């Protein structure tokens, strides 16, 4: 089990720790804080031990990408929690550069699963460029139609994604309302080929 959170405050981290998250997901890495943080930091939690945990996977002009490698029965998968800026007029350049930076992972050797608020839909050329010929969007692979995540109460946009290598297969994929969040959670069962 791997949980990726975005826009996490230090107060929320403390509350999660006090509530006993470590009893279920004892391994974690929080992204380093930067002036680019988009509402808070990105965090990864895992039930399995993490290897090569990093506070920032790749230089990106948005919230740092927390990342770690997890061994799935001999197959090592590199997970990342991502949150580029939204493509508002004042952030357009940062948003494009953030997605372009993430697209550079196509040239790395690891097997990747990137999870989070990409602030992008299939209508955005920058998101399609990020996927390139290597990565898939879990919603696309599941073949079940759109999984709207924003806004949480009456979602009209599919901006949260699980982006992964073609060597990872998606089983179940669903959205869940989480009280207090402005996005719905995106839950997936993944299998490593």
Task: State each model region's role.
Residues 1-2:
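Active-site metal-binding motif and surrounding structural segment of the metallo-beta-lactamase
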Residues 5-193:
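Soluble catalytic domains of enzymes that build or remodel membrane lipids, polysaccharides, and related
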């Amino acid at each position: 089990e791997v949980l990726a959170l975005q826009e996490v405050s230090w107060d929320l981290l403390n509350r999660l720790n006090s509530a006993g998250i470590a009893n279920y997901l004892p391994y974690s890495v929080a992204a380093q804080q930067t002036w680019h943080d988009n509402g808070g930091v990105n965090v990864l939690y895992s039930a399995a031990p993490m290897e090569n945990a990093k506070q920032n996977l790749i230089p990106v002009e948005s919230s740092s990408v927390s990342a770690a490698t997890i061994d799935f029965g001999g197959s090592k998968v590199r997970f990342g929690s991502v949150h580029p800026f939204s493509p508002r007029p004042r952030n357009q350049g940062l948003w494009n550069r953030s997605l372009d930076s993430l697209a550079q992972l196509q040239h790395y050797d690891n097997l990747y699963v990137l999870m989070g608020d990409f602030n992008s839909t299939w209508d955005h050329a920058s998101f399609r460029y990020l996927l390139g010929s290597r990565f898939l969007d879990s919603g696309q692979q599941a073949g079940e139609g759109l999984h709207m995540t924003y806004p949480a109460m009456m979602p009209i946009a599919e901006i949260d994604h699980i982006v992964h290598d073609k060597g990872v297969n998606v089983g179940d994929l669903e959205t869940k309302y989480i009280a207090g969040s402005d996005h719905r959670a995106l839950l997936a069962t993944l299998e490593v080929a």
